[in-house]
Amino acid sequence: MSLSRLLIKDFRNIENADLALSPGFNFLVGANGSGKTSVLEAIYTLGHGRAFRSLQIGRVIRHEQEAFVLHGRLQGEERETSIGLTKDKQGDSKVRIDGTDGHKVAELAHLMPMQLITPEGFTLLNGGPKYRRAFLDWGCFHNEAGFFTAWSNLKRLLKQRNAALRQVSRYEQLRPWDKELIPLAEQISTWRAEYSSAIAQDMADTCQQFLPEFSLTFSFQRGWEKETDYADVLERSFERDRILTYTAHGPHKADFRIRADGAPVEDTLSRGQLKLLMCALRLAQGEFLTRESGRRCLYLIDDFASELDDARRGLLASRLKATQSQVFVSAISAEHVLDMSDKNSKMFSVEKGKITD
């Protein structure tokens, strides 16, 4: 599916916008602070229920307004789907799909698989493990129908178990939680391991094209010792967990490590190389989804020109075109994206929250 129309109301510095979009490349050009990133963020929020630059809802809603409203029209090969999201200052959300209320944000995420490439996205490579878990979980969510429910239940059980650790004195008192937690943890870890194995070749091939000077390796770490039953780990770690008042081992501690020539990429690669690697990983993940399910991602790319020279921008542009996906690109100057444009592209000018084509 592609987003054929986007309506934005009271989001960031955008009062009202109604955009007719290209199913191919859409360029957002404007000075820093003009609102071009806000358009990308509106699309991302419509598909995720939250913004990517701030978790504080008050910063996302336009000044002195009570709520933002986002509406989109998704065009598929056989049908059109209408989607909407409203969120107020209290954080209450309303999701509407095809004119009916009561839907979940996860349904929007399923309808709009998207890949985000921003200057802040370096956290995938040099941030904590939670960012790389999120990378794997995106793939599991779109590959495994039961993943989201299992993941939600895991979060709930871990929260309850951690609260119980403050009150219990013997491991036997935790067994009711662990009886539910253990099979969930093992299932989620299995899904993550299978996904990381399945996508490994795609990542290796794409990374080789973007960074041929490095030998890159990927390894999934499930969050507890290899060849050890999670039940044994939980029981053996009880006293330490009780002192810490949290569960120290499990899928919530998993990681997906990436090395270049045997060393952590964050210690080896320059910022430009890290951006190329981030782009390669996002592309590989999107292309894997298309091959496995026939569904195409939306790609959101903020500040396209930063950190990349002309040759590398050209490589990224050609790979994005090859996906035949819908792509949204922000840039300070139209010169940075003109070589990516064709007769099906749309160029939007953004100035002080006003968007024109």
From Swiss-Prot:
Main location: cytoplasm
One of the GO biological process terms: DNA replication
Pfam families per UniProt: SMC_N
Alphabetized UniProt keyword annotations: ATP-binding, Cytoplasm, DNA damage, DNA repair, DNA replication, DNA-binding, Nucleotide-binding, SOS response
Any one GO molecular function term: single-stranded DNA binding
Binding residues annotated for ATP, in chain numbering: 30-37
Subcellular location: Cytoplasm
Assigned GO CC terms: cytoplasm
Top-level taxon in the UniProt lineage: Bacteria
Function: The RecF protein is involved in DNA metabolism; it is required for DNA replication and normal SOS inducibility. RecF binds preferentially to single-stranded, linear DNA. It also seems to bind ATP.
Name under which the protein is recorded: DNA replication and repair protein RecF
Gene encoding the protein: recF
